[in-house]
Regions:
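Conserved, compact domain cores that house catalytic/ligand-binding motifs in diverse enzymes
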Residues: 39-99
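Short amphipathic alpha-helical segments with coiled-coil-like heptad repeat character
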Residues: 12-13, 57-60, 198, 263-264
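Short helix/loop capping segments that flank catalytic or ligand/cofactor-binding pockets
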Residues: 15-16, 45, 61, 139
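Glycine- and acidic
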Residues: 30-37, 60-65, 78, 105-107, ...
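Extended acidic/polar, glycine-enriched regions
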Residues: 1-44
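Active-site core of glycosidic bond-cleaving carbohydrate-active enzymes
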Residues: 72-322
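Structured loops at beta-to-helix junctions and adjacent beta-edge loops in soluble globular domains
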Residues: 7-9, 23-25, 56, 82, ...
Length: 322
């Protein structure tokens, strides 16, 4: 519920309510996915999360039913995955994807956030992966190309993404320096965008752009592994240009999630970053999504279930209903 505050102007005033009416506004969709196990806490987490996802499925996929009730690219990107398994309503994914991108010409990043632009590109490939709907990929492909033209126009002389005027370098609500130079997490998302562009180009038999974006992904991946890796610390630093060699989880999670480094380095990341309590923990459910996805991909299922119990289970314990 949203809340209304009624202020009485008279000191001794009194108001009596005859009735309060609530309007429950939601899409009438069938659940195609379900979950049940012997762990009742996990069952409650699933049920609460599924209900939350359903509430956020309006004309578009909202970021939250309480606030902001807005279409944010990163939140939508995650919600697409949930939808494929929970409702499998492809229309809402297509509507949200088109709304996020907006009309031509592209003059700013999606929601002004570069990471959200990269997710927008990746989300289209993942939509095809889950649905096989090539017609939609074909329909938005011209916008994908113009989006990447915009992205390329804002890279630095080394073809790295660096913050430009009007950009909000978000990544996560986390305390690390995101404005000093070309941060690693953004480069890794750009690699993912290049890779997904190459895959979509291949679907449409656009050999020239398949080769172009595939080569760009490979070149940037090599550059990131060369410049951002710190062997002594066993992880990728946030920004190699500042000299402080600080490490946070975000870029290292992307390295695991998108398979952007060697198996040897992945093992070091798990030991020296992910399981290192001295590294600033992830504090938002938004980025926990990526962390737990990465942990599942590399088989760290105990880590995943422990986090579900402590983080989302903690919300349930405090009385959360969404």
């Amino acid at each position: 519920f949203r809340f209304v505050c009624i202020e009485l102007l008279e000191e001794e005033g009194m108001v009596q309510f005859k009735a309060v009416q609530g309007v429950f506004h939601y899409l009438d969709l069938d659940y195609v996915g379900s979950f049940s196990c012997s762990d009742e806490k996990l069952n409650r987490i699933w049920d609460t999360a599924a209900y939350t996802a359903h509430l956020n499925m309006q004309e578009f996929l909202w970021d939250g039913i309480k606030r902001d009730r807005w279409i944010w690219g990163g939140d939508a990107y995650q919600s697409f995955f949930v939808n494929y398994y929970l409702m499998n309503d492809n229309d809402i994914v297509r509507r949200t994807t088109r709304m996020l991108r907006g009309a031509e010409p592209m003059t700013m990043h999606v929601n002004t956030i570069p990471d959200y632009t990269f997710y927008w590109i990746a989300g289209i490939w993942e939509y095809y992966f889950h649905t096989g709907d090539l017609d939609f990929v074909r329909a938005v492909y011209p916008q994908m190309l113009s989006t990447m033209t915009f992205v390329e126009s804002r890279l630095d002389e080394d073809d790295l993404y660096t913050k430009r005027r009007g950009d909000w370098v978000f990544v996560d609500w986390s305390q690390f320096d995101k404005d000093s130079g070309p941060i690693c997490a953004e480069q890794m998302l750009l690699i993912r965008a290049y890779d997904c562009m190459a895959k979509c180009a291949a679907l449409l038999h656009d050999d020239k752009n398949e080769e172009k974006f595939g080569a760009a992904a490979k070149a940037l991946c090599e550059k990131v592994n060369s410049r951002y890796w710190d062997e002594e610390k066993g992880g990728f630093v946030d920004d190699y240009t500042t000299g402080n060699r600080s490490i946070t989880r975000h870029a290292n999670i992307f390295a695991l999630l998108y398979d952007l480094t060697s198996e040897d380095r992945k093992a070091k990341i798990i030991t020296h970053v992910i399981k290192n309590k001295e590294i600033l923990p992830i504090t938002t459910p938004y980025f926990e999504f990526f962390e737990l996805d990465a942990m599942c991909q590399i088989g760290e299922f105990d880590y995943m279930t422990d986090m579900l119990h402590s983080y989302w289970g903690g919300m349930i314990k405090l009385g959360a209903t969404t």
